Amino acid sequence: MRIIAILAAILLVALQVRAGPLQARGDEAPGQEQRGPEDQDISISFAWDKSSALQVSGSTRGMVCSCRLVFCRRTELRVGNCLIGGVSFTYCCTRVD
């Protein structure tokens, strides 16, 4: 009877040792799938009619502009900064023909 109890205890310990790394791998997987702030891109576009376009400064008239997280795209020109919710973004514009 003692031999069966000892063998059962050894078997349980062996199963716990094997299950431990599986749980650790399962905990790591969600962290690997999360995207960091450097991967995120925010784009906010503005559209207006001609009457309100007269109120816009001449430097951005005839352009489509967006607030980007860090850098402008290759076809865009950095015009300034956007402040949204207390966070500063890069203000990028491209010409509309």
Curated annotation (Swiss-Prot):
State the family it belongs to.
Belongs to the alpha-defensin family.
Main subcellular location = secreted
Give this protein's Gene Ontology molecular function annotations. Answer: protein homodimerization activity
The subunit structure is: Homodimer; homodimerization seems to be required for killing S.aureus, but not E.coli. Interacts with CD4. Interacts with Bacillus anthracis lef; homodimerization is required for the interaction.
Q: Which InterPro entries match?
A: Alpha-defensin (IPR016327), Alpha-defensin_C (IPR006081), Alpha-defensin_N (IPR002366), Beta/alpha-defensin_C (IPR006080)
Query: What keywords appear on the UniProt entry?
Result: Antibiotic, Antimicrobial, Cytoplasmic vesicle, Defensin, Disulfide bond, Fungicide, Secreted, Signal
- Gene this chain is encoded by: DEFA4
Q: Which species does this protein come from? A: Pan troglodytes (Chimpanzee)
Domain of life assignment = Eukaryota
Q: Which GO terms describe its cellular component?
A: azurophil granule; extracellular space; Golgi lumen; transport vesicle
Physiological role: Host-defense peptide that has antimicrobial activity against Gram-negative bacteria, and to a lesser extent also against Gram-positive bacteria and fungi. Exhibits antimicrobial activity against Gram-negative E.coli and E.aerogenes and Gram-positive S.faecalis, S.aureus and B.cereus and the yeast C.albicans (in vitro). Inhibits corticotropin (ACTH)-stimulated corticosterone production (in vitro). Inhibits enzymatic activity of B.anthracis lef/anthrax lethal factor (in vitro).
Among PANTHER family, the record links this protein to:
ALPHA-DEFENSIN 1, DEFENSIN ALPHA 4
Tell me what this protein is called: Defensin alpha 4
GO biological process terms, alphabetically, are: antibacterial humoral response; antifungal humoral response; antimicrobial humoral immune response mediated by antimicrobial peptide; cellular response to lipopolysaccharide; defense response to Gram-negative bacterium; defense response to Gram-positive bacterium; disruption of plasma membrane integrity in another organism; innate immune response in mucosa
PTM per Swiss-Prot/TrEMBL: The three-dimensional structure formed by the three intramolecular disulfide bridges is indispensable for effective bacterial killing.
Disulfide cysteine pairs (residue numbers): 65-93, 67-82, 72-92
Propeptide residue span(s): 20-63, 97
Point out the signal peptide segment.
1-19
As for subcellular location, the record says: Secreted; Cytoplasmic vesicle, Secretory vesicle
